[in-house]
Amino acid sequence: YRAFFNIGDDVELGVQAGTSYAMARHTMFDPYLGVLPCAGFPLGEVMVIDINEQRQLWRRPHGDFPAKVLSIGLPHNGGPLLTSTGIFFIGSLFESKLYAYDVDSGELLWQHALPAPGNATPMSYAVKDSEGNAKQFVVIAAGGDARSPLGSSADYIVAFAIE
């Protein structure tokens, strides 16, 4: 038994090797502008929850529409990285940026441009110099999906030193 149906040009198809299944992946953008997901605002948020007290500590929209025309919060794929010093790092699906928030207050501490969208979960590592002093780094894979109206197809690994 096989089912056939029409799909749009923006759909990526992939055979599931060794099975009788296939994958169809597409972006879910509005049919009018073609750039906004079909959902209400904010489209993406970050929040911190105190699990012990079972309460939300803070919540805020994450990411801006290009050229800061709208501060709507944008969806993101990657997860956060939380350092032992209370810095919360996270990338953005549509923006080519890495963000750092204060985990206690939600204050945006830092943001930096990336060569492509920060779709991945950041990670951290430390390197010791010849004198035994450790320096901590945050690294993120920056890449995109060429089908995304705000993204680009690219492959980068970008590292930042934490001072």
Residue ranges of predicted features:
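Blade-level signature of beta-propeller repeat domains, shared across WD40, Kelch, NHL, RCC1
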Residues: 122-163
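Surface-exposed loop/turn positions within WD40 beta-propeller blades
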Residues: 43, 85, 94-95, 154
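Short loop/turn segments that connect beta-strands within beta-propeller blades
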Residues: 51-53, 102-105, 163
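Short glycine/acidic-enriched loop and turn motifs that connect beta-strands
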Residues: 3-4, 95-96, 144-148
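A structural motif specific to WD40 beta-propellers
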Residues: 57-58, 107-110
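Extracytoplasmic beta-rich repeat domains
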Residues: 13-31, 36-43, 61-82, 113-124
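Conserved beta-propeller blade signature
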Residues: 57, 87-90, 137-139
